[in-house]
């Protein structure tokens, strides 16, 4: 769940930890969006639709590259015995081994499914869970720890260590305030801390956790309200700051993991990013309460070796003008196709766009509310 423009409305929101009220959801549909293919490695992907906060409308879609069919809202039909389906606000989705993990933020659990068919396996109870990464048989889940509400006295967050064989939480490590995305590099877990509930007193640090001892060893001062973090092949971390939505703008920073110090600043807004080889793709949907109270949108690409912006718009055919609110971003590691989701108003069905590697629209398809997170499936995994 990204920071949408009604940030302060969280102060009035108290959400139940159960799966929410009964909803009439969009039924499963099949749409032919592409020609059947014979991929070498990537056979398709799952897409997690967040659903609007409080609506209990998180849904799961699947694209089968071998048939070219896109199937929406598959979870309910696949798991008819699961009460009230996926839950409230799907915040992340990843695969590891034979399992598919969906982080359901406002329902306070991680849904664990079979990667092969999305059948329910179990749940991992973690309050206000945010994102998930994996390393050597363990899942690491960031947690705000407290309820979903703006609170200047909000407690420190933590990272839960989960045994992927038993789905049990085996340890917790306290980090900064309202921790977000994480990345593993060289036996260390790096955690971007936002402090988003403590507005305007945001956190501005990246926590460094030694995975051997599962203890925080350092905090790296970066910028206010951190969010995204990804690693590249050069031992660098790319960390985004949302800024404060007033005078301090969203920005992108580089951390050298050999020294655990900030090594660069790009001066570019980031709301979502993903890495493919030496290319870092960026969506910039930056909101400001000053300068017109609106959104500034960009689609940039960065060379991670040289740390330079090589393109200010990776969409080259003008389709970007159709996209109301760019939200999710992914790049197929085999075909290099680029996927961008449009959340529109956040309370209506969104759209997924597929672009060729050179930025031309290939196809689009309707999704659920706030389509956001993609997990690719590869042959031979799990």
Provide a role label for each language-model segment.
Residues 1-5:
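Positively charged n-region of N-terminal signal peptides that target proteins for export
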Residues 7-10:
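Sec-dependent N-terminal signal peptides
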Residues 14-17:
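C-terminal motif of bacterial Sec signal peptides marking the signal peptidase cleavage site
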Residues 19-382:
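Predominantly soluble domains enriched in secretory-pathway, periplasmic, or organellar proteins
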